[in-house]
From Swiss-Prot:
Region of interest: Disordered: 148-187
InterPro entries for this protein: Arginine_N-MeTrfase_2, RMT2/GAMT_Mtase, RMT2_dom, SAM-dependent_MTases_sf
Key word Magnesium present: no
Domain called RMT2: residue spans: 192-413
Locations listed in the record: Cytoplasm; Nucleus
Quaternary assembly: Monomer.
Protein name listed in UniProt: Protein arginine N-methyltransferase 2
Function in brief: S-adenosyl-L-methionine-dependent protein-arginine N-methyltransferase that methylates the delta-nitrogen atom of arginine residues to form N5-methylarginine (type IV) in target proteins. Monomethylates ribosomal protein L12.
Residues bound to S-adenosyl-L-methionine: 199, 229, 252-257, 273-275, 300-301, 321
Top-level taxon in the UniProt lineage: Eukaryota
Gene from which the chain derives: RMT2
Gene Ontology terms describing biological process: methylation
Length: 413
């Protein structure tokens, strides 16, 4: 073990500034990277000049320190302050906040295991580093967002969890109605969730308790979301006008939230849906015949732009829940929402951003707050404890791995 790696095991107690900070700073100033991993050290000691590959794990000093901490509550206040300074120093010298170690664990996972969760200064410092890194990455990429591990943040895959998707995936050509001339092949297994054009050409199947892509079994929507949708439906209309209430849901899926919105008795209930299989289901279930329902067929990027240009329809509540879209799409949606929402209206969405890991979920919670503030809007969250964690039977990949849900409620300040 190198001197740097040994130092961050916090071998002596109490943890004091004099015992750790000068030596840490000297090591980093000497040129040892703050991202120097145990895997790199092992490769060096074996004489492997190439070192570990990009696909290998990255057990950084931050991981080692997180593993070495005592259980939450066992650090004195003074020791906690020193540990924060150690974290600050590592970040100042370029430590990455989101590497995965030899157990495929994030530093945030290790802090949570020790009991340092939301509200604790050490955990919040890691979240702050994640927010800063992601916003900087967005600037470097010229506005394009690459979330967490380099994959796009997906609203598709329902939850927006970071996924390893191909850099590109060709989809079959579509006719003028948007239908595919052929089904995506097995090579396109992740393209369905990564690219909306591919998704819209992919056959869907309604099975008990879920809507999935027929061949790949990607979860588009599942009935474990019912309690979330019940809360969301009541939330977005709580500031409704007494005489007239207009609501918009973007993405019908299984129609869970639309059923709850109908119980709120809106004057007009707009539903934007682009997938032909879902539209066919809506027609069979009689949604087209409901006098208070307006179906907007097509991508929201097209239909909502026309509504905005028309300038006659404004909403008390807007909800967004689509498949195979990314956070970059949400940023585009925000531009439309501010023009379509009433002054006292409420916007919300299915919040699975980063929900494959608790720390990533908390990072994106902050990022949404910051992004909405640029529009003069506030984002407040209600925490919903999930009574029963989702099961993923008959679904290829989970899209939500946290034991609670942050329901966003966004409105003008």
């Amino acid at each position: 073990m190198s001197l740097l790696h040994h130092l961050v095991t916090l071998p002596s107690r109490p943890i004091t500034r004099d015992a750790y900070l000068p030596q840490l700073q000297n090591l980093l100033r000497s040129g040892i990277p703050a991202t120097y991993t145990l895997e790199q050290l092992a490769a060096y000691e074996k004489g492997d000049e190439e070192g570990p590959g990009d696909e290998d794990t990255n057990t950084t000093p931050l991981h080692i320190m997180a593993r070495s901490l005592p259980e939450a509550g066992q650090l004195s206040e003074a020791e906690s302050e020193v540990v924060l300074e150690i974290m600050d120093t590592l970040f100042q010298y370029g430590a990455g906040w989101n590497f995965l170690d030899y157990e495929q664990k994030h530093a945030g996972d290790l802090l949570l295991e020790k009991g340092y969760g939301p509200g604790d200064a050490l955990y919040e410092r890691l979240v702050e580093a994640g927010v800063a890194a992601e916003l900087l990455l967005r600037k470097v990429n010229g506005g394009e967002i690459e979330f967490l591990d380099g994959s796009d943040t997906e609203m598709g895959d329902k939850g927006g969890s970071a996924r390893d998707v191909p850099a590109s995936a060709d989809s079959a050509p579509a006719d003028s109605a948007g239908h595919s001339s052929s089904e995506p092949t097995a090579v396109d297994a992740d393209a369905t969730a990564a690219h909306q054009d591919t998704y819209l050409q992919t056959e869907l199947e309604y099975i008990p308790g879920a809507l999935v892509t027929k061949h790949n079994r990607d979860g588009v929507m599942m009935d474990w979301e019912t309690d979330i949708m019940r809360v969301a439906a009541a939330s977005i209309v709580k500031n409704r006008e007494p005489a007239e209430c207009q609501v918009l849901n973007i993405g019908f899926g299984m129609g869970i939230i639309d059923g709850f919105l109908q119980e709120q008795r809106p004057t007009r209930h707009y539903i934007c849906e682009a997938h032909p299989d879902v539209l066919a289901r809506m027609r069979r279930e009689g949604w087209y015949e409901r006098p208070d329902v307006v179906i907007l067929e097509g991508r929201w990027q097209d239909t909502l732009s026309r509504l905005l240009d028309d300038g006659t329809v404004f909403f008390d509540g807007i909800y967004y829940d689509t498949f195979s879209e990314h956070y970059t799409d949400m940023l585009e949606l925000y531009d439309l929402v501010v023009g379509l929402i009433k002054p006292c209206g409420i916007f919300s969405f299915f919040n699975g951003l980063g929900a494959d890991r608790q720390v990533c979920y908390d990072v994106y919670r902050r990022i949404v707050e910051l992004d909405m503030a640029t529009y003069g809007m506030t984002c407040e969250y209600t925490t919903i404890d999930l009574r029963q964690l989702p099961t993923w039977d008959n679904v290829r990949r989970s899209y939500f791995n946290c034991d609670h849900y942050y329901h966003p409620e966004i409105s003008f300040q």
